[in-house]
Amino acid sequence: MFIRTENFQTFIRLYPVVTFILALQAVLWLFFSLPAHSVVLWRDTVTGYNLGVANGEWWRLITPILLHAGFTHLLFNSMSIFLFAPALERMLGKARFLLVYAGSGIIGNIGTYVTEPLDYVHVGASGAIFGLFGVYLFMVLFRNELIGQEHSKMIITLLAFAVLMSFINSNINMMAHLFGLCGGFLLSFLCVQKKERRY
């Protein structure tokens, strides 16, 4: 379920939404890494910035999901998406998977806006990724037949570790993680159908 054995072409064919997300955030990281002044201005316009949201720049609740602070940040989040997102795209379908992913990220950014000071600045897909864990948590609690006992234990262990690290690491947007997790869990009531089959 979480072990990728597909070749490149098969991965793209089976998981088009996941592929698009991975490619888009990589392209955006490369673009915004350019030292040009105009690029820096563009980045400042789409970065998560609570004061900007307060001034009506609502897109800042969406765009930070695709942005990253550095290569390590991008790599870690991309690996998390690569490992944990494909199974959900297959189980939920493209539309519902995208709803969960984007919805959780937006909910995480709304939570950041509500709880953090106005000068708070943030980027990253972590809220959306925690939303995926929220879906898995829903399955562990209510639809265990979809993932099985072994994967359930793995999810609980990984989630406990991730939440713990969110509290320990001061550079992590803890509110995006927690709100994203809750968002993914709640969206599961809408997106995880009774007819769903195990991956």
UniProtKB/Swiss-Prot annotation:
Family: Belongs to the peptidase S54 family.
InterPro entries noted in UniProt: Peptidase_S54_rhomboid_dom, Rhomboid-like_sf, Rhomboid_protease_S54
The species this protein was found in: Bacillus subtilis (strain 168)
One GO BP annotation of this record: proteolysis
Protein topology in the membrane: Multi-pass membrane protein
GO MF assignments: serine-type endopeptidase activity
EC number, UniProt record: 3.4.21.-
Keyword terms: Cell membrane, Hydrolase, Membrane, Protease, Transmembrane, Transmembrane helix
One matching Pfam family: Rhomboid
The name this protein goes by in its record: Putative rhomboid protease YdcA
